[in-house]
Amino acid sequence: MNTLLLLHPTIVTEPQAVEAAKDSLAQKLGTDKSNISQHIIDRVATGQVSLRPSYYNHIQYLAPPEANVKKLPVKCYEIIFEALQSNGVFEGTIPPESATDGILQGFLVESDTKWVKPSTLGSVVSLKRPAGQNKTKSSAFKKEMPFFKKLSSPPTLTDSSEADEDEESQLNEKLKGSKLIYFDESSDDEIIDEDELLRDDDGALKGPVVVPVKCALPNGKRRKKACKDCTCGLKELEENEQNERLDAQASILSKLATSANAEAEKIEERLRRKQASKEGEEVKFTEQEVTEIDFTIQGKTGGCGSCALGDAFRCDGCPYLGLPPFKPGQAISIEGLGADI
């Protein structure tokens, strides 16, 4: 008996377990231990070791219990099936989930740990009848058969193939004509206006217009949220309201940012002036600016000509507001105005 022992890669590290399995298998099959060959299943699956086809009577798969969870590749079952003889047995630690793969390869699954390769050849059984029955049947059959008289000359046959071809051609022409009529675009075809299907001859609607039911609650209140398959337009209204709300928020935020920037610039300018006044920095004007401001310069007069008379006669924007009256041509110092400018 040709026997093969397939080993899991982790079981190879335990030589004692392998030898014990070989002894048990030899005792079970009643064969010599030397008749049992062994290979690692990974090498068989990758093709490094080739098995002889239809050679083994028994193939045993030895693996640790935890290997029962992981399925073997389908290629392994195909190789094992080809290596077994008819009625050969494959058993061992076979994953239960691999039963379908085994059936697809041709195995008969007898149990979770035993598969059998069925025999593809069946015995031929010849069916014979008794000799006496055959004779009686044949004689009776001969008596029942009628006899016909042979005619002296065979009847003449006429060739009707040409008529059949003519009929077939006429039938084909009729079929082609009927098909072409269906696809023919004739100007006589009447085109129906879709509006006429909705209105009568008087122009009135044939039936009431079906308005989609609004997404309203029984008590008359509006729903907080439109239905998933809303058809009354509530979903579009909600989207428009949301877009308007987002636009308003964006506008407010932009205005706030603009005002904040302007306010920050004013604060920075105010702080700069305050710091300059603390450090005693004097505001200096160019000659043209002094000429425009100081109306006491000879040959220059104010717009109203009353700057030297006092605040009662000075304009609202006069730079001499708050100063006492002075004589025309008198030198006026405006250094005190540095903090206000």
UniProtKB/Swiss-Prot annotation:
Region (N-terminal SAM-like domain) residue spans: 1-157
- Enumerate the Gene Ontology biological process terms: iron-sulfur cluster assembly
Q: Which cofactor does it need?
A: [2Fe-2S] cluster; [4Fe-4S] cluster
Extent of motif Cx2C motif 1:
304-307
Tell me which residues bind [2Fe-2S] cluster.
C215, C227, C230, C232
Region feature Fe-S binding site B, mapped onto this chain: 304-318
Molecular functions per Gene Ontology = 2 iron, 2 sulfur cluster binding; 4 iron, 4 sulfur cluster binding; electron transfer activity; metal ion binding
Residues annotated as region Disordered? 151-171
Region of interest called Linker, as start-end residue ranges on this chain: 157-204
Principal cellular location given in the protein's record: cytoplasm
Q: Where found, per UniProt?
A: Cytoplasm; Mitochondrion intermembrane space
Disulfide-linked positions:
none
InterPro entries given in the database record: Anamorsin (IPR007785), CIAPIN1 (IPR046408), Dre2_N (IPR031838)
Which keywords appear in this protein's UniProt record, sorted alphabetically? 2Fe-2S, 4Fe-4S, Cytoplasm, Iron, Iron-sulfur, Metal-binding, Mitochondrion
Domain-related comment: The C-terminal domain binds 2 Fe-S clusters but is otherwise mostly in an intrinsically disordered conformation. The N-terminal domain has structural similarity with S-adenosyl-L-methionine-dependent methyltransferases, but does not bind S-adenosyl-L-methionine. It is required for correct assembly of the 2 Fe-S clusters.
Question: Any idea what job this protein has?
Answer: Component of the cytosolic iron-sulfur (Fe-S) protein assembly (CIA) machinery required for the maturation of extramitochondrial Fe-S proteins. Part of an electron transfer chain functioning in an early step of cytosolic Fe-S biogenesis, facilitating the de novo assembly of a [4Fe-4S] cluster on the scaffold complex CFD1-NBP35. Electrons are transferred to DRE2 from NADPH via the FAD- and FMN-containing protein TAH18.
Q: What is this protein called?
A: Fe-S cluster assembly protein DRE2
From the UniProt record, report the name of the gene that encodes this protein. Answer: DRE2
